[in-house]
């Protein structure tokens, strides 16, 4: 009898070609065969379905002239452009957001130095325009418009066209010059002037008569007085003399006084300063192209929406922040649990507790069902969109917080300011170290939150279905519910869209639940019968063995001795 029942069950399993059990609906999430590893607060390697790289490492091979206006200095740096050196005439009236200085820029006029080079360079760059206003200067009994063979323009001796070299008169006179200019305008004026340092005393007297000369330039709040430093120097473009250029800013209502008895390189006017402008300068050999980008580095323009970059510390415009890391991945999907390859003899389905689902194209979260009409999969767009909105929101905020506008991280200093340069680099290195650490921590925190959010949305979906089904179904513990009533595809759809009415199916579900539990109870006796049968069989086998031994002993076939 027992063997017949077992044989019947085996035949039923092998011959079953369609699903005849109770309907089952499962909640699950999207998965892929190979996810992306991200870092969280608690784990260095967490596999997620999708992630976005936040660190940009690629640049365009050119500088983009739009939307920022770029001015190419070509062979002229910005100071030579302001002085009016030969070869820099193309910069007259130039206006820029970023002034492009080239590493191969050269001086083309009389050799000079600027004691406060970096400050003047910064003022000119920030001004964003070479707006030169010519003025009338009444110099007394001196020869103007001095020229030099070191300063050729069209193969003719010339000089800086924004400056006026004053020398003694033909009558061998260089009287005291005392000239005042009042700023009656509504903007600040930048005056650039110089002091000539001859190579010998003879040159000093030949040019200016007075030895030593002196130049004093004053405003209401400042005064600069320079005595020429006469001495021989290495020849540069045939000259051993030098010019030192200085600058003075005259605010509206203030005045400037030039006082000299020789050696003055006088201005021909002033530059109009625009305090509202926020421009800058970039030293790079990268050519200007025809692309569009709001971010420029010395290695090329950057076109990206990533919040970080490890291309260059020097970044100008609306640029990602520079970090040391080569990669920071932000999770944009849930934790990845690859789908199992096999689903068993019945093709059984499982929910999110066991694994994810591959091929859930329409959304991250969804349903799978199994009923008399077959199996199916559908996305749950509401929970998916809720998670996407939260992730996109944090990504946008991250990008918005880290964009830099017209910020140059690394500055340049001349050799005289070496100690300042070392200090500045130390400060910048420290800032970059701190920000790189903060960026890594921020991304890890966001990744942790993303995984928590996506897990939470999955649990919300599961709880929503559980509240709908109530006693009409049983939680199988793997993200699925076994439904105790007939549930066709329309019924399944009502569960998915939240319109399921459990009262309609309540009576049928209760009856089926009791019947199924009764069958399970009856089927439970099979195990008891099997154990009883096994025990009786073992007892009979032992009894037969003992009977055989006793029979053999009586017939003398077996001899038994007991020793004490």
UniProtKB/Swiss-Prot annotation:
This protein's record includes keyword Acyltransferase: no
Residue numbers on the Cytoplasmic membrane side: 549-564
SUPFAM superfamilies: Influenza hemagglutinin (stalk), Viral protein domain
Site (Cleavage): 343-344
Major localization class: virion
Residues glycosylated per entry: 14, 34, 178, 310, 497
Superkingdom, natural source: Viruses
Record localization: Virion membrane; Host apical cell membrane
Modified how: Palmitoylated. In natural infection, inactive HA is matured into HA1 and HA2 outside the cell by one or more trypsin-like, arginine-specific endoprotease secreted by the bronchial epithelial cells. One identified protease that may be involved in this process is secreted in lungs by club cells.
Extracellular side stretches: 17-527
Keywords: Clathrin- and caveolin-independent endocytosis of virus by host, Clathrin-mediated endocytosis of virus by host, Disulfide bond, Fusion of virus membrane with host endosomal membrane, Fusion of virus membrane with host membrane, Glycoprotein, Hemagglutinin, Host cell membrane, Host membrane, Host-virus interaction, Lipoprotein, Membrane, Palmitate, Signal, Transmembrane, Transmembrane helix, Viral attachment to host cell, Viral envelope protein, Viral penetration into host cytoplasm, Virion, Virus endocytosis by host, Virus entry into host cell
Endpoints of the signal sequence: 1-16
Subunit structure: Homotrimer of disulfide-linked HA1-HA2.
Function: Binds to sialic acid-containing receptors on the cell surface, bringing about the attachment of the virus particle to the cell. This attachment induces virion internalization of about two third of the virus particles through clathrin-dependent endocytosis and about one third through a clathrin- and caveolin-independent pathway. Plays a major role in the determination of host range restriction and virulence. Class I viral fusion protein.
HAMAP family: INFV_HEMA (MF_04072)
Name this polypeptide is given: Hemagglutinin
Annotated source species: Influenza A virus (strain A/Budgerigar/Hokkaido/1/1977 H4N6)
Lineage: Viruses, Riboviria, Orthornavirae, Negarnaviricota, Polyploviricotina
């Amino acid at each position: 009898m027992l063997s017949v029942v077992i044989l019947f069950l085996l035949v039923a399993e092998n011959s079953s070609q369609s699903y005849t059990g109770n309907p089952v609906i499962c909640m699950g999430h999207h998965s892929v065969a190979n996810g992306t590893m991200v870092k969280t607060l608690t784990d260095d390697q967490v596999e997620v379905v999708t992630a976005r790289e936040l660190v940009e490492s690629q640049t365009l091979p050119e500088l983009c002239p739009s939307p920022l206006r770029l001015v190419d200095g070509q062979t002229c740096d910005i100071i030579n452009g302001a002085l009016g050196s030969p070869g820099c005439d193309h910069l007259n009236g130039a206006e820029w957001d970023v002034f492009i200085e080239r590493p191969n820029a050269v001086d083309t006029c009389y050799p000079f130095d600027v004691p406060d080079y970096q400050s003047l360079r910064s003022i000119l760059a920030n001004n964003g325009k070479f707006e030169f206003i010519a003025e009338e200067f009444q110099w007394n009994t001196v020869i103007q418009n001095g020229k030099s063979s070191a300063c050729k323009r069209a193969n003719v001796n010339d000089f800086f066209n924004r400056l006026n070299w004053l020398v003694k008169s033909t009558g061998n006179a260089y009287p005291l010059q005392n000239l005042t200019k009042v700023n009656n305008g509504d903007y600040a004026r930048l005056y650039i002037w110089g002091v000539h340092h001859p190579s010998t005393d003879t040159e000093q007297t030949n040019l200016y008569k007075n030895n030593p000369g002196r130049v004093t330039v004053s405003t209401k709040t400042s005064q600069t007085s320079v005595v020429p430093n006469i001495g021989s120097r290495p020849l540069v473009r045939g000259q051993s003399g030098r010019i030192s250029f200085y600058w003075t800013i005259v605010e509206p209502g203030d005045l400037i006084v030039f006082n000299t008895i020789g050696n003055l390189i006088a201005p021909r006017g002033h530059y109009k300063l625009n305090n509202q402008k926020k421009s800058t300068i970039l030293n790079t050999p990268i050519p200007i192209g025809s692309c569009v980008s709001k971010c420029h580095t010395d290695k090329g323009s950057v076109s990206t929406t990533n919040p970080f970059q490890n291309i260059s510390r020097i970044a100008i415009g609306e640029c990602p922040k520079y970090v040391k890391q080569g990669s920071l991945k932000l999770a944009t999907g849930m934790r990845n649990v690859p789908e199992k390859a096999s689903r068993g003899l019945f093709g059984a389905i499982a929910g999110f507790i066991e694994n994810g689902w591959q091929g859930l194209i329409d959304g991250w979260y969804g349903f799978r069902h199994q009923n008399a009409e077959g199996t199916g999969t559908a996305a749950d767009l509401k929970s998916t969109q809720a998670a996407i909105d939260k992730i996109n929101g944090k990504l946008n905020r991250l990008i918005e917080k880290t964009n830099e506008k017209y910020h140059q991280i690394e500055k340049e200093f001349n050799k005289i300011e070496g100690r300042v340069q070392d200090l500045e680099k130390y400060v910048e290195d420290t800032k970059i170290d701190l920000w790189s650490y903060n960026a890594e921590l921020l991304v890890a925190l966001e990744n942790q939150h993303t995984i928590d959010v996506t897990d939470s949305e999955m649990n919300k979906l599961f709880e929503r279905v559980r509240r709908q089904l109530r006693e009409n179904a049983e939680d199988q513990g793997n993200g699925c519910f076994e439904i105790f009533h007939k549930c066709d595809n329309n019924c399944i759809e009502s569960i998915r869209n939240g319109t399921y009415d459990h009262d309609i199916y309540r009576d049928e579900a209760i009856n089926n639940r009791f019947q199924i539990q009764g069958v399970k109870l009856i089927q439970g006796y099979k195990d008891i019968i099997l154990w009883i049968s096994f025990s009786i069989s073992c007892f009979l086998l032992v009894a037969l063995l003992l009977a055989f031994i006793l029979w053999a002993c009586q017939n003398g076939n077996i001899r038994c001795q007991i020793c004490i």
